[in-house]
Amino acid sequence: MSFKIIGTGSYLPPLTVTNDDLAKTIDTSDEWITQRIGIKSRRISEDESTAEMGYKAAKEALIKSGTAPEELDLIIAASITGDTICPTTAGGIQKLLGATCPAFDINSACSGFVFALDTAAGFFARGTVKKVLVVGSERISKIVDWKDRNTCVIFGDGAGAAVLTEGDGYLDSKISTFGGDDVIKIPSGLNLSPYYKKETELGKIHMAGQETFKFAVSRISEDIKYLCDRAGITPEDIDRIVPHQANERIIDYAAKRLHLPKEKFFVNIESYGNTSAASIAIALAELDHKGGLKKGDKIILTAFGGGLSSASCLIEW
């Protein structure tokens, strides 16, 4: 037994920061950002925590699925920007919902939401859960260097969620980690020990753009081919592909490598930027609520991120 998705939700904070807004504080322009990344604006949290945004996305997903918080058997939250090291983001969402089930976090950067889905699949396979809430929520703005034009223009805040129940909709997956911190790195920025001798780096995002780009294009195309080969289908047979929204040019290159029309890929990076672990969850909810998915559709969710990591899954709607 696996699972099927019965409800999705998303939340974006109200403050919109445009490329022109950023151009007032750093050396950049709307044209530069749009051509290189495909982003026009992003949402930034002014007073909402990671858990609070996750709660709002979760609440919408629960309503869409007709599920009460007390019906949940498990909550998994994917995030790298938790409000505290302890307790967990999932625990904060649980409290806000008034749920009583176990709740824990997964930290796998932008791949986190798909890692969380794959983790949930194991609980369903063992028959220990009937309804699971999976959330991706990020307040990336708090770890961005807003003076670095190569990174601050990319990211945004937000949350997405999905409610899962028993079913046969989760067909296959591929999750990978390529250990190393030289391409995408966020130091903890914390050291109170008088005995630790190494210099402590500030907890802000460091990213090697070209290496990230190459890795992303290769992982998207290879993971999609892998899942299709195992299912005995071709990429052309996939109805929709929901990729991590990191850079529209990555999606363009992956589509060309797979010889697929770009229209098969759902893209919303223009309005929200890269929301890390929330990215695919937000995109899936938007596609769902716009009526872009129908029963029986074969969908691939495909992500890549720090770790380095990648995660893709084949689901039937």
Regions found by a protein language model. Name each.
Residues 1-47, 148-214, 218, 222:
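Condensing-enzyme catalytic core mediating Claisen C-C bond formation in acyl metabolism
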Residues 1-19, 117-181, 284-317:
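Conserved beta-strand-centric core segments of catalytic alpha/beta enzyme folds
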Residues 5-7, 48-108, 228-252, 257:
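Conserved beta-ketoacyl condensing-enzyme motif
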Residues 5-7, 33, 61, 75, ...:
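Conserved small-residue
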Residues 22-24, 81-92, 131-152, 175-196, ...:
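Active-site-adjacent elements of ketosynthase-type condensing enzymes
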Residues 33, 70-78, 104-107, 130-137, ...:
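Beta-strand segments within the central parallel beta-sheet cores of soluble alpha/beta enzyme folds
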Residues 34-36, 40-52, 79-132, 256-284:
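Conserved catalytic cysteine-centered active-site region
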Residues 200-269:
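A contiguous, well-structured pocket-lining segment that forms one wall/lid of small-molecule binding clefts
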